[in-house]
């Protein structure tokens, strides 16, 4: 099958076939599939939790090594390539694709959960619980999470723009194996299915969460039909954006989102628990950095309750970020041509982590402060309602709540828009500008599937499948890291070989200048 700009690859049909099997099972046998996948997920967490901790920490360490090493000077592209986007637009795009919607949804809910309901180490509802809660939020949304995104993105961008390989996962493994045949197609198909399951579950759960927020504000019911209307509206908007391309749709919406998020953050910082949040940010940043090695390898042997918490939160999050990484990494790589490895890794690893820390400190800090001072019982609300409950204690709460819903919706749109772009790339042999036709097809597949799963109650089962798929994909990620290191070492040796020649040429020019000066004298 051909489109206006390229050929749809067989991996598209294989991925759709595999996806249909999963979706049909989730629609027809949601309870059975959820039970089976939950058991498998629990087995992986209990048996291979140690592996996840080591692997994800390794990804973060490799990113830090790239920042401080001489390899950081290497361009993602030809040596004279210039960045396609300015810093602010580039950062807005990668942040919107990576974690933007999660910060809005869980900015208040996650710190409140650790603080009031399920504290990992101390008594719930205390100031100590507030400090511990924020420390673990920093850990789960900090450099480990962004390290996963950064490592896959840097591999994809390096091999695509500098080595001329297709913008596919298989293209990053060429130094280790021949990926032109079935092996490469299988790897790309696996990444495609992981991307689709991740986006579908996010569309479904996102619709439920938006329904919860609208219900809190306008006293509307929470039901399938309202969620379907939300998905239909979002689909029309993200497909319209997708048809306009990166330089219009996603770029404009991402910039708009960052401005709106900054306005909302400044409002909360002004009318929320300002000093408590500032002190909490400062204190947590110190304890996070101080205890980062311990947190990175904390597995709690011989302590069943602590180990259960680690499985349910830390291991789950590492698997979740890994499962999302094919989509987020591909998109970040696509918009990063012309950057050096160093500036790319700093921008993807450090900057979003700090922004997330600030957001959680003010939003989550204000929520916990309100609960500590008995202003409002936020822990009695659902996750979908906590952000709006917190805003209800501040001036112009109706307006700020509507702004929050708009912010969630636009993050929703940019995520789905980016996803259709990435799926289009993977379906057309890594094309950096996939045709609108294939993006439209994927957009419809995502939306119809999300609606079907909402109707059947199979969303949780598909999310479990996504988390399970993270385990084998983490092995592919490790292979990508070794492949990148091997290729960088080869390139570094070429630089070392060329260096004496540069010195000789420079010395020759100096000798010529000296000779010329002598002649004139």
PLM regions with names:
Residues 1-129, 243, 266, 482-492, ...:
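N-terminal alpha-helical transmembrane segments of multi-pass membrane transport
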Residues 1-5, 29-44, 63-82, 133-140, ...:
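Membrane-water interface regions at transmembrane-helix termini and the short interhelical loops
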Residues 2, 35-41, 69-87, 112-135, ...:
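Flexible loop linkers connecting adjacent transmembrane helices
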Residues 2-10, 45-49, 79-97, 133-143, ...:
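Transmembrane-helix boundary/entry motifs in multi-pass membrane transporters
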Residues 4-6, 10-13, 18-27, 60-65, ...:
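Helix-loop-helix module between adjacent transmembrane segments
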Residues 18, 51-68, 261-272, 355-365, ...:
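Hydrophobic alpha-helical segments of multi-pass membrane transport proteins
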Residues 182-186, 190-339, 346, 351-402, ...:
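Membrane-embedded translocation segments of transport machinery
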Residues 499-521:
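Long, low-complexity, intrinsically disordered cytosolic termini of multi-pass membrane proteins
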